[in-house]
Each structure stands twice: as structure tokens, then as C-alpha cells.
């Protein structure tokens, strides 16, 4: 979907470059830079001065969670804060026929993964929201050798700042305790990624208005906060500028564009580009072409 975002912004740049004499201000088009690598490329752009003098900022994300032609809007927190953890379970390698002479890091890592699931299930209040996902396990390179170590990598997503601050401690406690109980050790690294995207109330209300004006009131979907992270938060937090971020629907069952993002069969309904450009154009016209 990121190529769709780039296409939308290129269209906006072309459109308003032909209307510069009608703009009562300056329009800056910011293409997303290295969002996938925590802490995200947005903070680098902020440090480079891109946000200097900016009064407000708008963002969007194409989403197969919502039908094409619909806009997901919410006041306040839209996305979770997104962090990464890496764990190295260290054991003692050896021959697979002599496990008693080894400390098996594969079994150790398996127990750590199961233990981590208890954080959300048993150590977090039901009134809080969090997702902890183990997404990579790497270890061993032969069928008959118990390896010396196994690496585990995953992500943590939270909305509460207090809970976010507690997560590294809980992950470390479970990982180190499990490793010690099995005669091994482990190393835990925790990297803070993007903060939550917090939509400004005034701009969010304006977004609802322009969407309703351009596409009809039924195009506005009042959604719940979503768990995927987004480094747009750096523009509003570190950049010190109010912003609004909306979800642009691209789900169309007949076209086969209902697959989730990051699925190998994901396809984008390109009609969503029209709605994305329309949203940006409407917001810019309301602000700069009065």
C-alpha cells in the first residue's frame, strides 16, 4: 500500500503546483521515509527541520479493513505505540543424541515464547489494551546438532504510557527467569519505536466536515483506535504541531482487495487513490484557499 500513498501525494503535489497563485500559505508534501525501521524515518525529518514553521499536518493510510469510499476517523488516539524486543536464549550446544550434556536453547526459547503470552493474558488489566507478538525465531543449522543459542524477535503495541514503560521489565523478568530455570542464560534488548498517533480534536472535526461535504455523510466511519503503529506521531509529538490522520478504505470483495496488509496476496483497490487525493485536496483547500 505504500506505493499508493506515494501516488496520492504525487497527485496532490501536481494539483497544487498548478494553483500556487491561489494558495494563502505554503504547502509541504512529505513522503514517508523509512517507516518500517524503528524508531521510524519521521523523527529524522523532524530533526532535519522539515516541520519548522508548520501550522498543521494531515496524514492518511490506505486500509483494507474498510470499504472503498469510506474514511475511518477517530478523535484522540488512533494508533498504538509500537516497540521491538530481541531475546537471545543462550544454552550449551552439542550432539542431538546426547541432550543431557547440553542446555537446549530451542526448548528454552519455546518456553520463553509461551511465558511471554502470559503478559497480556494474566499480567495486564482487562481494561488496558496491548498486543505482544513473537514474529521471528532463529536457531540451529543442522538436523543433528543442538545449537548454542536461539534468537527471538517480536513487537509490543500499547496505548497506555504506564503500561508501555512496564513491558520491558516484564519481558526481561520472564525471559531471564525461564533461562535460569533451565540452566541457561539470555540477553534481552528492548527498542522503543513510534509513539501513538494522537488526532487533534479541531482538525479531526474539520476532517469529518470536509469528507461529508465532498463524499457524503455516510462516507465517514467512526472507528476504534487501531493497533498498527505509525511514525506520523513524530510530526505531532516531536514536531510540536497539531495533526489528523485518517484511514482510507480500499476493501472491495469483488475486486479481491480484502486481504489484510502484509499478507502475500494483498492487493490494493486503486479507486482508493481517488478518495485519498480527495481528502488531502479538501483539507488543503479548506485551510489555504479561503
Where are these regions (language model features)?
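Metal-dependent amide/peptide-bond hydrolase catalytic core
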Residues: 110-290
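Histidine/acidic-residue-rich, glycine-tolerant segments that coordinate divalent metal ions
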Residues: 3-4, 9-10, 16-147, 230, ...
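Extracytoplasmic/periplasmic, Sec-exported soluble proteins
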Residues: 1-4, 195
